């Protein structure tokens, strides 16, 4: 991270970080970038910011914000009262419910359980990676059919890049929920072993 900051300063470039999916406590910290000891010039937020109500945010350092003048940055729908109220409620819920701590704790548990699962299926699962409740499990095969089989058993997951199962559960997930997720994967995965 330090070398990236040096390059940014050397080339007088802005560091813009997209926190649209990784932000709002999902990784166990409010912003995902906080895990890496860097300070961006601009951060973008959306999705989790208002719990499903459409909203986006553009955050910048004070130094950069002072370069904006009236009309430089605007939005046709900016400041929508409903969306802003929803965002305020989400921020309150994250703090009051200790959801960042839950994301960190249960996320670590999820990653540990998925790595244990990897030991049971080493020819199918090549890697488990992530932070908090933003986790990927890379497979040696396409994951679409696994996703469909899990869905038939009540587990909603996604497959990205063709062979990476993505786990992005709600911030209120419990260890019991993770145990259920692992049990379903233990039922589904044997069918995909050669």
Regions found by a protein language model. Give the residues of each.
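Conserved N-terminal phosphate-binding loop of PLP-dependent enzymes in the Aspartate aminotransferase
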Residues: 3-194
């Amino acid at each position: 991270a330090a070398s990236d900051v040096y390059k940014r300063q050397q080339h007088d470039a802005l560091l813009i970080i997209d926190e649209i999916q990784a932000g709002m406590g999902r990784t166990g910290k409010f912003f995902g970038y906080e895990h890496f000891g860097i300070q961006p010039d601009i951060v973008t937020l959306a999705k989790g910011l208002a719990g499903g109500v459409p909203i986006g945010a553009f955050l910048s350092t004070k130094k950069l914000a002072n370069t904006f003048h009236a009309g430089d940055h605007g939005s046709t729908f900016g400041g929508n009262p409903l969306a802003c109220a929803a965002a305020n409620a989400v921020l309150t819920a994250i703090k009051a419910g200790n959801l960042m701590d839950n994301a960190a704790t249960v996320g670590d548990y999820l990653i540990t359980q998925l790595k244990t699962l990897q030991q049971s299926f080493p020819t199918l699962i090549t890697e488990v990676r992530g932070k908090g409740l933003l986790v990927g499990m890379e497979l040696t095969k396409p994951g679409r059919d696994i996703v469909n089989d899990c869905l038939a058993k009540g587990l909603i997951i996604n497959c990205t890049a063709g062979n990476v199962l993505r786990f992005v559960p709600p911030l209120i997930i419990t260890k019991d929920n993770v145990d259920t997720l692992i049990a379903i994967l233990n039922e589904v995965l044997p069918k995909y072993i050669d």
